[in-house]
Amino acid sequence: MPNIKSAIKRVRTNETAEARNISQKNDMRSAVKHAKAAIAENADNKQELVRVAVKKVDKTAQANLIHNNKADRIKSQLMSADK
């Protein structure tokens, strides 16, 4: 446990940021999973789910939670599976 006041604050803010980052990554993964399931089932709303998933992937990459190449790979897989 840190003794310096600013270090104590950093621990607190890091915990908050970590929780936010984990939540955002989980939301992205869920959106991708729902989109892939909709594509597999050929659901009526698959275009909408793919659009939402791509948006969440872009937001996650923009926040540097995943690498840009990984984001591009996920989006490419969604688009090619949707055809």
UniProtKB/Swiss-Prot annotation:
Keyword check for Ribonucleoprotein, yes or no.
yes
Q: Name one Pfam family in it.
A: Ribosomal_S20p
Q: Which Gene3D superfamilies match?
A: Ribosomal protein S20
| Keywords tagged on the record | Ribonucleoprotein, Ribosomal protein, RNA-binding, rRNA-binding
Q: Spell out the GO cellular component terms annotated for this protein, sorted alphabetically and separated by semicolons.
A: cytosol; small ribosomal subunit
InterPro entries in the cross-refs: Ribosomal_bS20, Ribosomal_bS20_sf
Q: Which HAMAP family match?
A: Ribosomal_bS20 (MF_00500)
Family, per entry: Belongs to the bacterial ribosomal protein bS20 family.
What does this gene product do? Binds directly to 16S ribosomal RNA.
The name on file for this protein is: Small ribosomal subunit protein bS20
Protein's organism: Staphylococcus carnosus (strain TM300)
Gene behind the chain: rpsT
